[in-house]
Amino acid sequence: MTLIYPATADAFRCIADACRHTCCKGWEIDIDPDTRAKYVAMTGEIGQRLRDAIADTPDGASFRLREDERCPMLNDSGLCDIITACGEGALCQICADHPRYRNEFSTFTEVGFGLCCEAAADLTLHWPQPMTWHTQGGGTRPQGSPEEEALLQARAALIRIMQDRTRGIPTRLNALCEAAGTVMPTRTAAEWADFLRTLERLEPAWDTVLARLTNAPDDLPDFSPLAVEQFTVYLLHRHVPGALLDDDLTGRVLFCAVSGMLFLRLSTLLGENEAARMYSSEIEYSEENLCSFLDELDAAGDE
């Protein structure tokens, strides 16, 4: 299968123990069947620790998190004992992939880097050139199905709108909505905060952020044009392909535009990197929250 990567791919590096928000804490870490079998067969102290750490359920295996929600294989220095003892090749699939996400098409797969990872957020938001994507090993991308190609052409046009640096960010976000046949909802910062409070919370600190958003001015700040561009382009790249499954291209584009606007507001409160990391963690990495957001935007369109 041909893989398509963003221009940032070669520059991405996990910052390991320097990470302030480790991906080895607070998440359910599933263990794929092949890796589980490998862990069960391992000898020595690391093998015993792995067997003790595996929780088997009817839905599959996962790591049994500690009381502080840290993975039992994450040591006090913030490093993974599996990597230290056995190398990166011993990681389960989800750990080897993270923070990568995949968009699966009929003849190729797109791979990107989720912004819940602070290293990926820092790299993506401050990438100076308009984001591009490249086929692994060079060459051209294989042709997809007619439906896929139509959607990819639409997405490319939307990304061009967002990358038009002759226009301001609010103009670009509104142009995205117009291209999708909709308009940006006219809600205050406090109203958006009220909606976000109805969603599942993954970090307690999110409540504090939403309280600050409630009191934020309603005028959009003139702030972080590069970061907002890259953030919104990332969302378009990642979420527009979902329309192949739910046939909701308009809703998904509106989600990207609204999220770009909210990121702009949150960046003034938290800074660019933390705003992206928290928003991605709270919204993108909860399927329930993402679906609720799309439903809310669908309802807003009927108002």
Model-identified regions with their sequence ranges:
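General secretory precursor processing signal
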Residues: 17, 22, 26-27, 74, ...
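Internal, well-ordered alpha/beta segment that forms a basic, Gly-enriched binding/recognition surface
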Residues: 78, 82-167
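Short, compositionally biased low-complexity segments
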Residues: 11-18, 129-133, 231-238
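General N-terminal leader/first-domain-start detector
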Residues: 1-48
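Compact, glycine/acidic-enriched structural inserts
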Residues: 41-52, 126-135
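Immediate flanking context of iron-sulfur cluster ligation sites
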Residues: 1-19, 51-92, 109
